[in-house]
């Protein structure tokens, strides 16, 4: 099945992303510790992440032209996080460094035997965007605008600019935020975490929740990631599901797997693939990401992704 809309071609960037960045402190342990115990860590690593920043880095590695808009703190973590985006070649003209603020951080405990993780995070309130602070003119510069829906009123400003200019709007949402109902009618491609449709609609059955999500807000493509079961899309009255792939060499860390999935999915759309093929590409990029610690180290190049797809048939 093809997308039910055309992506524009006359844009400076293939994809632009407005949303979160973060610096992750990764802590690898043999198994997740029980209460009132001590566990020696196997590895500690500082790594850059954040839903939207990671998606833009992933698309850039795949050979597309991307730009990122978001706020970094003025602390050493912020300097580190910003340098990782810049060094990948992602355009940062709309990035802001907020004086006397701390960049978003996360402490992520990863179980070595499964690769599953638990995240404890913090975000400085000074990094939040008010609607009048949204980067006007940014969203319209990409064929696709990708959002993570933090600061929904500001996201709505950027999304409205994008829609008015013919840009397709994509959103990766994992939680319910104040002002979200005003943003969602502006989203063309809405793919959330496996819990998101239920949380928003109150409907337990996944497929029924996706149908209600589309009926309520009008997104032409809706879906959810399903972890090790792949992903599910609902479009034009049809459900399309693609199973997950195994991480090459085994799963080391699931941190950022959803961000990587979105990048692979959007990559497929941007290069003209069908929804079915794009789902497989999303699952492939997510699987490859999981082969190393951190959200970004194992994100593939175009050649690496093509080789992986050949290997899985």
Where are these regions (language model features)?
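Gly/Ala-rich phosphate-binding loop of Rossmann-like dinucleotide-binding domains
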Residues: 60, 163, 270
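Conserved phosphate/ATP/ADP-binding segment of small-molecule kinases
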Residues: 161-243
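Conserved phosphate-binding/catalytic loop of the ribokinase/pfkB sugar-kinase fold
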Residues: 97-98, 108-144, 149
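Conserved phosphate-binding/catalytic region of the ribokinase-like
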Residues: 1-17, 40, 206-313
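Short gly/ser/thr-rich secondary-structure transition/capping motifs
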Residues: 1, 124-130, 169-175
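Glycine-rich phosphate/adenosyl-contacting loop at the front of the ribokinase-like
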Residues: 1-71, 76-80, 87
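A glycine-rich helix N-cap at a beta->alpha junction
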Residues: 87-100
